[in-house]
Amino acid sequence: MKSLNRKNIINMTVLVTLIVCYALKFLVPAFYALTDKYAGLFVFLCECLLLVNNFNVFKAIKEKDKEFFFISALILIIGINLIIVNSGFGAFFTAANFALIIYASDKIILSKKQVIFLSAVYMALLLFWLVILYPSYFGSYDASFALNTNGAATFSTYTALLALILLAHFYEKHSFFELFIVLLFVRILRLALWHRARGAFIILTVFIFLFYILKGKFIESKKIYTAMVFMATFGSLIFVLSYTLIGKTGVNMFIPIFYKNVFSGRENIWYEFFSYFIHKPLTGIGTNLTIESFVEFNVHNAMYDILVIHGVIVFIMTMVIVFKRFNSYREKAKKNTLALLALCVLFAVFYESFIDMDLIWADYSVNLIFLTAVINAKYEE
């Protein structure tokens, strides 16, 4: 009993600490500037602590646990590849954190009460942000604020969907909470459109489609579900290829609600990264280079980032872990509504990361940890 209590205390302390850091990163510009370059390392250490706290590593080594040795080999290869190409240090944590979070997701088992508590923390953060800070930061569309407007919309949408778990829990007992859910969606949708944030809009609309329109029925068919996982991963690369080929023809269309063109520069970014990648397909290109197509080193696609920065071997090994865990997520989502909700959010973030990096960005890592923990939580109490 004491060991169980100790494990729960460590789990909750680490997760709450990560959520607090997540809040400070977005709400306090000075904190973001001070800690940004250490975010990946901090997440990696926290994830290692969670893994050791919930999984007997020494037993896994002694019993020659194949999956444990697989993830260890993957993390080692990530590091070796980056050394070979003389890459920047931070790239290691981008790929390693994502792989480790997905791998450890079936080992960090929270109770329903812990899930609800953490969702309540997200709700408190969301309310504080929307009611108190947001009006002062963006009431006059102050573009000079350190947190860019697109990031503010994605942060708001992502946080809202994690807070939605709390409302969904209460809705199961009290139907009038449906009103609060509708109000939340209206507010977040308006915010996403006002900021002209395509990423936030994609997350919200994909989630609503999967959870409320399809009502999660996609998990009933293994073939459809597997196809969705394939599209969320390998389909992202197909999207990059198609988008780049079409964009290079010069054709374009204007999206009225976002006041942006369909092809707004990503085709050039992705083409440039590919031009480097074809010379180093096994090791990836790393990050020790300057690109000409954008003002910063940003791949703008999570799956493509893992592929071009870390190479084919790392990408394939990462996909093995992703597909294996997603198979288990399906079984979990069949048994519980909150797990299904979290799975739909996870899919939404995967699909949003066709055009951005939010799936593997260190600042959003705690959200990924929480989503996978909600899916794998123990709801029978």
Regions found by a protein language model. Name each.
Residues 1-79, 110-113, 169-179, 331-335, ...:
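Transmembrane signal-anchor hairpin modules in multi-pass inner-membrane enzymes, especially those
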Residues 8, 57, 63-68, 221-222, ...:
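Hydrophobic transmembrane alpha-helices and their immediate junctions
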Residues 134, 212-257, 274-276:
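A membrane-periplasm/extracellular boundary helix in multi-pass inner-membrane enzymes
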Residues 255-310:
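Long extracytoplasmic/lumenal interhelical loops at the membrane interface
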Residues 110-139, 150-215:
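Alpha-helical transmembrane segments of multi-pass inner-membrane proteins
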Residues 48-60, 73-129, 162-169, 212, ...:
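Transmembrane alpha-helical segments and their membrane-water interfaces
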Residues 339-352, 358-381:
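Transmembrane alpha-helices of multi-pass inner-membrane enzymes
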Residues 30-38, 84-93, 149-153, 182-216, ...:
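Helix-loop-helix junctions and helix-breaking kinks within/between transmembrane helices
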